[in-house]
Amino acid sequence: MKRLEDHESFEMAFLNQLASRRLTGSLVFGGGTMLRLCHELPRYSLDLDFWFYNETDFGDFFGRLREASSQAYEITDAQEKFHSLLLEMRRARGTTKLKIEVRKKVATAGTSEQKIAYSPHFPTQVLVRVFTLKQMFKNKVSALIERGEIRDAFDLEFLLRKGVDPDLSHEETNAVVKRLKGFKKRDFDVKLGSIILPDLREYYRVNRFTFLEEKLTFEKWQSKS
């Protein structure tokens, strides 16, 4: 856990660096790391994912992002791709790298809000604009269906426990349940077990995503009646 705690401190330091350079105002923070830092998601996440808050010159922003990052960290990779801006950095040689992805897409109006990013492993809080939990649920449904990562299923169950309404189509519900049934013992023991907090590991080994599956299938049945 010490390695993950140190990496989380790195993530917070990077957000603080962005805020000090007035770059956070152009971005909407999303993904698992946002849920961890802004909503206390009980798992660690290694990357930072952003969308644009408003129309922006992508090339100009990428230049400012690289400049701000290089002042504090060693940049190990930087690419402007067709759909996103990618940046990878580390604090020192031999330390874990932090990957940043900024999608070349403006977040839909009304899907974001301001929140405080916080970690017990970093001394400063950072004000950021993030996706609403309702929008994060939609994003995570799409992610789980597309890539089938167990962390996305964990995040969906977390969002349901936070009271988010599972507004899915029948096709989406079927696709999500199919993904849930496809996870193996190793997925829970290794993939999920390595990133969630220790006191939750045994629960998910035994119960898996029973709560998530029952909630989705109940909503599906209820919508038919």
Q: Predicted regions: what is each one?
A:
Residues M1-L27, C38-L41, Y53-S225:
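Structured mid-to-C-terminal alpha-helical surface segments
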Residues F29-T33:
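Glycine-rich beta-strand-to-loop/alpha-helix junction loops that act as flexible
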Residues D49-W51:
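Short cationic amphipathic helices and targeting signals
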